[in-house]
């Protein structure tokens, strides 16, 4: 057959509704909004083509390879209820298209080019199914949930954290003092804010030293293991590693990284270092809403969460369901399960498009953070369960008596909720009463209850099904 030049419709090659997906394929669910007049099959096929082997024209060198072996295929299209112009296109990618152990390469292939495509008005990657064969090429989280509990010797309850505020402007010594007060009061962790790196008012090395001093002092006084998430994020990978190495030399238990602004390549390098050197790795998702907040365009956070589990991190921020930041309950619980569990069944009511088998990849602790306070404690304990980190920044440091009493209030509230749950009480129904009872014997909690009794952030979540 001679080579026939010319532009042909994508769907002739890339729309294959009879295709049986393989266990080794990476499967993607895209929410596609085509330009008027572009039929769904053509739009779905265009997505498959442009994110795999295709280009806009038949090329001579197509004859030198086997397209059937390497092309992405749009194998199913379904309408979106209530949205005339949108549909879900399912695309299968052969495993050979991807470099082993590289989240960077996976994203460059699947979402790197196709989002600017003219025939589409909007495109959103809703979910990915990562095949076991590909999962096994990743190290994943440095330690995972069980190893973290063993390192910290803390079981049977969520962990408590606090972001040090004001996030910018404190000197290293005053910053360390705030860390000490919070840990001394009963928190497990304190945290650098995501944008605390190494600024003129507080260079990273000074902060690391004062925070290490604070946590050792609090550890000695409370007999509990304490941690402060030292943010190693930096302008270059070399500088990031230098900071992580210094943290290890100080003997602290945990460091932190902003995985989206820092990038997946840097994140995976840091995760490997953390596993080799016994450091836990806390991950902040700064910039995620730029990517995941629009309903019809971008990448859903559940995909970014899966990518983080592959790249590596022991904690990741995942919304609160109840505080000031985005997150609808069922959807949030869907990706929380994808972070923690070994095996997650397909469940469209929770936004999970594919059954995901993580085999033995360690799990990640979800971190609830943002506008939460003691009155939220029963709901958070019920929604997130034991394997989570509950982080109260303003909800600790905003206590009228100061940081340590703020920490005491949170710890008492948490212990009361865990005890009530273990006794079989219904946290959703009796939550306020449980907190009130506990506040009778904790003046710190009583003061916190008074301050936060009426604060709510009431807006509709954008991220609904």
From Swiss-Prot:
Q: Which residues form the active site?
A: 165 (proton acceptor), 284 (proton acceptor)
Q: Where does substrate bind?
A: 113, 163, 167, 285, 317, 369
Give compartment(s): Plastid, Chloroplast
Keywords tagged on the record: Calvin cycle, Carbon dioxide fixation, Chloroplast, Disulfide bond, Lyase, Magnesium, Metal-binding, Methylation, Monooxygenase, Oxidoreductase, Photorespiration, Photosynthesis, Plastid
Spell out which residues are annotated as carrying N6-carboxylysine. 191
Q: Which InterPro entries match?
A: RuBisCO, RuBisCo_large_chain_AS, RuBisCO_lsu_C, RuBisCO_lsu_C_sf, RuBisCO_lsu_fd_N, RuBisCO_lsu_N_sf, RuBisCO_lsuI
* UniProt xrefs under CDD domains: RuBisCO_large_I
Site entry: Transition state stabilizer:
324
N6,N6,N6-trimethyllysine, modified sites: 4
One Gene Ontology term, aspect cellular component: chloroplast
Main localisation, per the record? plastid
Give the free-text PTM comment from the record. The disulfide bond which can form in the large chain dimeric partners within the hexadecamer appears to be associated with oxidative stress and protein turnover.
- Molecular function per GO: magnesium ion binding; monooxygenase activity; ribulose-bisphosphate carboxylase activity
**Catalysed reactions, semicolon-separated:** 2 (2R)-3-phosphoglycerate + 2 H(+) = D-ribulose 1,5-bisphosphate + CO2 + H2O; D-ribulose 1,5-bisphosphate + O2 = 2-phosphoglycolate + (2R)-3-phosphoglycerate + 2 H(+)
Cofactor comment text: Binds 1 Mg(2+) ion per subunit.
Q: What does this protein do?
A: RuBisCO catalyzes two reactions: the carboxylation of D-ribulose 1,5-bisphosphate, the primary event in carbon dioxide fixation, as well as the oxidative fragmentation of the pentose substrate in the photorespiration process. Both reactions occur simultaneously and in competition at the same active site.
Question: What does the further note read?
Answer: The basic functional RuBisCO is composed of a large chain homodimer in a 'head-to-tail' conformation. In form I RuBisCO this homodimer is arranged in a barrel-like tetramer with the small subunits forming a tetrameric 'cap' on each end of the 'barrel'.
This protein is called Ribulose bisphosphate carboxylase large chain
Organism listed in the record:
Cornus florida
What gene does this protein come from? rbcL
């Amino acid at each position: 057959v001679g080579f026939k030049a010319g532009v042909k419709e994508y769907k002739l090659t890339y729309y294959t509704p009879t295709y049986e997906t393989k266990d080794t394929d990476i499967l993607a669910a895209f929410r596609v909004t085509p330009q008027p007049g572009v039929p769904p099959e053509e739009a779905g096929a265009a997505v498959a083509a442009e994110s795999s082997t295709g280009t806009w024209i038949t090329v001579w060198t197509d004859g030198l390879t086997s397209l059937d072996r390497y092309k992405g295929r749009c194998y199913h299209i379904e309408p979106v209820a209530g949205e005339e112009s949108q549909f879900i296109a399912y695309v299968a990618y052969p495993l050979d298209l991807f470099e082993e152990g590289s989240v960077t390469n996976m994203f460059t292939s699947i979402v790197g080019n196709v989002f600017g495509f003219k025939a589409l008005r909007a495109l959103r990657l809703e979910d990915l199914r990562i095949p076991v064969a590909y999962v096994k090429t990743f190290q994943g989280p440095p330690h995972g949930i069980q190893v973290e509990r063993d390192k910290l010797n803390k079981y049977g309850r969520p962990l408590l954290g606090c972001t040090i505020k004001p996030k910018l402007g404190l000197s290293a010594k005053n910053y360390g003092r705030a860390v000490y007060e919070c840990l001394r009061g009963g928190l497990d962790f304190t945290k650098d804010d995501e944008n605390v790196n190494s600024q003129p008012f507080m260079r990273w090395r000074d902060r690391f030293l004062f925070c290490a001093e604070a946590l050792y002092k609090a550890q000695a006084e409370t007999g509990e293991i304490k941690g402060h998430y030292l943010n190693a994020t930096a302008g270059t990978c070399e500088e990031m590693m230098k900071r992580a190495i210094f943290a290890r030399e100080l003997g602290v238990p945990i460091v932190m990284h902003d995985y989206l602004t820092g990038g997946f390549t840097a994140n995976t390098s840091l995760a490997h270092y953390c596993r080799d050197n016994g450091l836990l790795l806390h991950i902040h998702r700064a910039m995620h809403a730029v990517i995941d907040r629009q309903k019809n365009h971008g990448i859903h956070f559940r995909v970014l969460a899966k990518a983080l589990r592959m790249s590596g991190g022991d904690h990741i921020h995942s919304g609160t369901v109840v505080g000031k930041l985005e997150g609808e309950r069922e959807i949030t619980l869907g990706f929380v399960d994808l972070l923690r569990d070994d095996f997650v069944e397909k469940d469209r009511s929770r936004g999970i498009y594919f059954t995901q088998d993580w085999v033995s990849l360690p799990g990640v602790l979800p971190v609830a953070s943002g506008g939460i306070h003691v009155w939220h404690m029963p709901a958070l304990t019920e929604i997130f369960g034991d394997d989570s980190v509950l982080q109260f920044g303003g909800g600790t440091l905003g206590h009228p008596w100061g940081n340590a009493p703020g920490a005491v209030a949170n710890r008492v509230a948490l212990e009361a909720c865990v005890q009530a749950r273990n006794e079989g009480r219904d946290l959703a129904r009796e939550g306020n009463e449980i907190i009130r009872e506990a506040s009778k014997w904790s003046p710190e909690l009583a003061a916190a209850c008074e301050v936060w009794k009426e604060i709510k952030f009431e807006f509709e979540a954008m991220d609904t099904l």
